[in-house]
Amino acid sequence: MNTMTLTPGQLSLSQLYDVWRHPVQLRLDASAIDGINASVACVNDIVAEGRTAYGINTGFGLLAQTRIADEDLQNLQRSLVLSHAAGVGDPLDDAMVRLIMVLKINSLARGFSGIRLSVIEALIALVNAGVYPLIPAKGSVGASGDLAPLAHLSLTLLGEGKARWQGEWLPAQTALKKAGLEPVALAAKEGLALLNGTQASTAFALRGLFEAQELFASAVVCGALTTEAVLGSRRPFDARIHAARGQQGQIDVARLFRHLLTDTSAIAESHHHCHKVQDPYSLRCQPQVMGACLTQLRQTKEVLLAEANAVSDNPLVFADAGEVISGGNFHAEPVAMAADNLALAIAEIGALSERRIALMMDKHMSQLPPFLVKNGGVNSGFMIAQVTAAALASENKALAHPHSVDSLPTSANQEDHVSMAPAAGRRLWEMAANTRGIIAVEWLAACQGIDLREGLTSSPLLEQARQTLREQVAHYTQDRFFAPDIECATALLAQGALQRLVPDFM
């Protein structure tokens, strides 16, 4: 069990990855408590003094001008959660719900939200007990925060809706009881604090980033394997070429290729004096294309890490000044744009991989048997596997369309520009699955190509990559049912089988 002491505003990317991958036992760092209590005291003072403050004693959205009587404040917060839990679609899996919950706790514990420590501790208790609220995947436009998803999360705190406990969907009240927990009653501002925020959008995009990192590393390894399979040159990875341009991502990717390929191999020596002058772009320009993708991954990391540690509530409580100020930190435009840029990178990683697969199919370009199989005609080899890769690459081109340029006004035009960040992040998952399928086909094809260079071997690391596959998937001597091999290679990639061969690049 992963144990984590949460210091609000200081989550690292590796901690977020661990939260996504594994159940966690959270403990709130004691340094957060004074700030949390001070913000609650500020809210209580506003109520006691009869001052009007949005979200504390007013309605919401277009109804913000409606003053709410003190005796209705608790009911106001409960009603807010119930009415806003209007999501649709399949439930998010436990890993995604857990990540959203931890992001929410991290934001609330910063001490700008006016929410009691006991409510934050109730959220922590849900995480620690493995009680996962049923959160539908769809229903947020990423401003004013992720209202519907976070309302569904908050329902479980109230004992409403459904939650999953030990793999079983239960009424939330039952799940809480089985876990030894009690529902909470919300005080002034607490419902709004729970619902306002970009935590669902950020979690969606973070998953996309985590998957993109694996895809990037796997594609670099497969690109190096393909370079060997088609007797490509190592010269385009010369450090001097990339230093002359000065693009850091490109420089770093070329270094990764030099690490994987080493100075030479038996395959490289076999064509050292060949007549070829230049390789096709899908080989020669790998550092340039993958370097640009790496730059996007790094920029996305910076944006999402900042957002993961941000306060995206509204209004914000500045206890030291005794003020509650309305702003727009709930607007997830930074997340939407980061997800859009990441989508371009995921699409290009797959597109370049597909072009290398196509290169291996062409006997004139690869100097290998057509479609990587002997006795062609009787055998079709990798012919349709390449078609599958092309289909996946084409789907990704459509999915890469930017979401952040779209907006539909909501809440009777009070919320007249929105980010569409949840959709921007969520489509990354499908794109990642598509790209993983493409890379799986390339891995199969490149290893087949190297096998066909009979008696010749590649570099030690690339031989490891080939051996890892060959332990699960046999060499193709004649046609066989192909889909299980793609499924096997895809599963190995998802487990990080090739990623572990690549030094840290983020």
Swiss-Prot record:
GO terms for cellular component: cytoplasm. Its EC number is 4.3.1.3. There is a cross-link at A143-G145 (5-imidazolinone (Ala-Gly)). It holds the Pfam family Lyase_aromatic. Its main location: cytoplasm. One of its GO terms (biological process) is L-histidine catabolic process to glutamate and formate. Pathway: Amino-acid degradation; L-histidine degradation into L-glutamate; N-formimidoyl-L-glutamate from L-histidine: step 1/3. It comes from the Bacteria. Contains an active site 4-methylidene-imidazol-5-one (MIO), which is formed autocatalytically by cyclization and dehydration of residues Ala-Ser-Gly. Keywords: Cytoplasm, Histidine metabolism, Lyase. Belongs to the PAL/histidase family. This is Histidine ammonia-lyase. The gene is hutH.
